[in-house]
Amino acid sequence: MLKTSAIRLPNPERLMVTWDTGRRCNFDCTYCEATRHDNKSAPHSYQELVRTFEFVKKYTGEQLVNINFTGGEPTVNPAFWQLAEYIHTNETRFRLSLTTNGAWHPKNTDRIAKWFEGVTVSYHAEGHAILKKQTMDNIKLLHDLGIWLQVNVMMHVDHFDECKQICAELKELGIKHNPRPIGDGGIDRKGWFIDSDGSQRRTSHDYNDEQTKWYFEYLGITSPKEGRNCCGGRCVQGKVNDKWQDVNFIDTNFKGWACSVNKYFLHIDQHTGNVYHHQTCQALHDGRRGVLGNLNNTDDIFAYVQANKDKTIICPNDRCGCGMCIPKAKSIDVFKELL
């Protein structure tokens, strides 16, 4: 893995709004914490979702925007489909994409193909056999319809052979897919713990040597590498010894780097109403982490953005769990050249 002193995007990218539309989910994966999903929360109404979209419109101004809907599981809420149709029909500067477990009712496949630019399906081996079959059937249908599609196969340490089989099937079908290790290597999360809802969770999996060997061989990597690649598949360049070159696996220790996360991302948690620059890093200005504000008082959000519009975010995190694919640099002078 190459050590970089700066990251840049060779191609322009739209601002990405990741919108967690609600906690409710039809899966209950042990590696997904209670703060991310449940099976009891009431779905948010169409009116609530439209109000949030009006905030997104105001926040993004005249920019071209990608909205990626996440959850929970977005497709279990009927109001989600109403919102998607409304945006697709009436708002031309927004492109829609969907991150889903893939177990939607087959009647919704045509809606997805019509209203969405692309879909990322996460295959979860812990799901019920009926739901997993539905997921694979839906994946094949979308592939046949020609929509942009990628499948993240969540490589469950206890169901590794099943996950390998799914990868082989997707490869044979010519469907873009990524075997994804579960977790980011957090030592404290590799064991079981009691979550806030009383459930047993294990959010980082500890793979044995044979599993690790299969993973790197499947990716065509001759020796294990630390770091991450972009989960959205973006092309990324790194500055290595003062020269720019394409990079894949990136060292994710950016603490103290100047970062443009606020210019490329916005995250909305519909369940809590909290709004962040980015879902996982939650970086703010002045070396802090936290929320921009809440949907119940968007005036405060706009006041914060206006007060900090000329300031640079300095990464406060020891590790970048996502967001490594946006312009950033160790040197503030190099960073200014990237913008």
State where each predicted segment sits:
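Secreted/processed peptides and extracellular or luminal domains of membrane proteins
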Residues: 31, 35-38, 198, 204-205, ...
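Conserved C-terminal portion of the radical SAM core fold
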Residues: 118, 130-244
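Short cysteine/histidine-rich metal-coordination sites, predominantly Zn2+-binding motifs
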Residues: 43-53, 335-339
